[in-house]
Amino acid sequence: MPKLSVIVPFYNVRQFAPDTVRSLRANARPDFEFVLVDDHSDDGTAAVLERAAEDLSGVARVRHVRHDRNRGIAAARNTGLGAAQGEFLAFLDGDDWLAPGYLSELVAAAERLDCDFVRTDHVRVTDRARTVRRVPVGLRDEVLDPRDAILPADRTTSVDYVSVWAGAYRRRLLERGLLHFTEGLHTAEDRPWTWRLHREAESFAVVNPLGVFYRRGISSSLTRIGDVRRLDFIRAFDQIVEETAADRDAGRLLPKAVRQYCAIMAHHLAEEDRFEPAVAGRLRTMSAAALRRLPQDLLTEVLETMDMDRAARLRRLRRRAGAGKGAA
C-alpha cells in the first residue's frame, strides 16, 4: 500500500498543469502515489498529462484516469478516491502547486499525531502577490475534537476554512464514507464536505508544514464567472443545514450553519452586479426562497448578531419574500 495518494483533478489547465506536475515530481517518493484525473479536457491538458504520467512513473506510483465527458471537480475527486490506494489521502487542484518536500513533511506530521486528519495553512497567489492564509484554529500540533472546532457560531472557525487540498486524511475516513464529494455541485462542493468531516471524524490537528500554493483570480474560475453555476452555493448550504439539523448536536451546531449560509448569501447579493442580469434575478429569487426554508426563529437570532449592512440586506429580502408569499 502506498503511504500517500495525492488526487489531482485537471480540466482545461494546459497553461498551469506543467507547474503542477513539476511540483509533484519535486515531492515524489517511491511510496507515494499520484492520481491524475483528466475531467475530459479539450485544450491540450490531456497531452500534458500523458507525458506527466510517463515521467512521474519513474519516481513514484502513478494512476492516470480520463473521464469520457466533463463531470465537474466533485466527480473528478471522487474518481480519484476510487482509484487511490494510499494509507493517507490528499488533494491538489490541477492549477496549483506544492513546495519541494512538502508532502513528506505533511505525512510525517500526520503519522506523529495519529489523528483522523490534519490541516495546514496555505499560500494564496494572486498575480505576483502572495498571502499566507491560516487555519482559524489557535492550537497547533495538538489533537482536537473536530466538532468543537465548528464553534463558536459568531467567529471564523475551522469549517470556514474549506481548502480541502490543505491537509491529509487517513484512509479510514474514506472507508467510513466521509471523503466523497456531492456530485452535481458546480461550486461550493467543498463546504458540505468540510462540515461532514468536522461532524463525523473523531480527531484532527493543525500542523505547521506550509507548502500549498493556491492560484486565485484565474479568469476561468467560477469565482470570476457570473453564470448560473455560481448559484449552486444555495444547494450546497441547503445540504449543510439539512444534515446538521439531523445531527445529535443540532441545537449547538445549527446556529453556525445558518449564520455561515447567511454570510455567504449576503456576500453574493452584495456582488450581484457581477452576475449576468438574468442570473442576478435568479439569485434574489432563490435566496429569498432559501431564507423561507430556514428555521425562522433561528434566522431572526442570527440576523441580530450580524453586521448592519449584511443583516439589512437579508432582512429586506426576507420581507419581500414574506410579502410575496402572502400575496400568493
Identify the meaning behind each predicted range:
Residues 1, 41, 54, 156, ...:
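Short, intrinsically disordered/low-complexity patches at protein termini
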Residues 1-232:
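Nucleotide-sugar donor-binding/catalytic module of glycosyltransferases
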Residues 258-268:
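P-loop NTPase catalytic cores that bind/hydrolyze ATP
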Residues 249-260:
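Residues within HEAT/ARM-like alpha-solenoid scaffolds
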Residues 67, 73, 108, 115, ...:
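General helical secondary-structure elements
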Residues 31, 273-328:
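Membrane-interface aromatic/basic loop that binds lipid-linked glycans or pyrophosphate carriers
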Residues 209-217, 223-251, 265-267, 273-294:
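Catalytic core of nucleotide-sugar-dependent glycosyltransferases
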